[in-house]
């Protein structure tokens, strides 16, 4: 990152709580080269991990970059699966096999080991797991704010933000 106008940085506590799966490696840059040599995010001016999941519009090819000339918000199959998992659980106040299958499909695609998959059938614990999974899966896709408002969690999460930003 060059600390220019198009760089995007992540909340460190969110980064530290992010599962060590394939998404984390793709979504974040934690070290990079500068004109002064190799640095880690903790050595950088902002001391924050860089968000690196955007398309490289200048070069016309996908790549890892903390810069984005335009943020592409999309709805993905993972979004549909997690919406289903949450909605069916809230509608019936129970976790059915299809809801478990939906969240586990997202987790398996992300590279979770079998023992890391969500297996709870407690509705409260399950909806919390879905909320967390949505945060990790849709990191920096501009969905988090709406999740926080919808679930009335803004004040709960705001205390953990850097510089008052709820970018995730």
Predicted regions and their residues:
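Polar, glycine-rich mid-to-C-terminal structural blocks
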Residues: 1-14
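Acidic/polar-rich alpha-helix caps and helix-coil junctions
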Residues: 20-168
């Amino acid at each position: 990152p060059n600390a220019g106008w198009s760089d995007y940085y992540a909340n460190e506590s969110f980064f530290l709580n992010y599962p060590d799966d394939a998404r984390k490696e793709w979504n974040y840059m934690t070290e990079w080269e500068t004109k002064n040599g190799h640095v880690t995010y903790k050595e950088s001016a902002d001391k924050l991990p860089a968000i690196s999941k955007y398309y490289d519009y200048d070069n016309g090819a996908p790549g890892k970059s903390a810069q984005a000339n335009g943020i592409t918000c999309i709805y993905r199959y993972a979004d549909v699966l997690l919406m289903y998992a949450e909605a069916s659980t809230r509608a019936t106040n129970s976790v059915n096999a299809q809801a478990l299958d939906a969240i586990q499909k997202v987790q398996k695609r992300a590279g979770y080991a079998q023992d890391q998959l969500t297996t709870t059938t407690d509705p409260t614990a399950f909806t919390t797991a879905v909320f967390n999974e949505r945060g990790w899966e849709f990191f920096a896709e501009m969905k988090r704010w709406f999740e926080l408002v919808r679930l009335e969690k803004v004040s709960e999460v705001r205390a953990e933000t850097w510089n008052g930003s709820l970018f995730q």
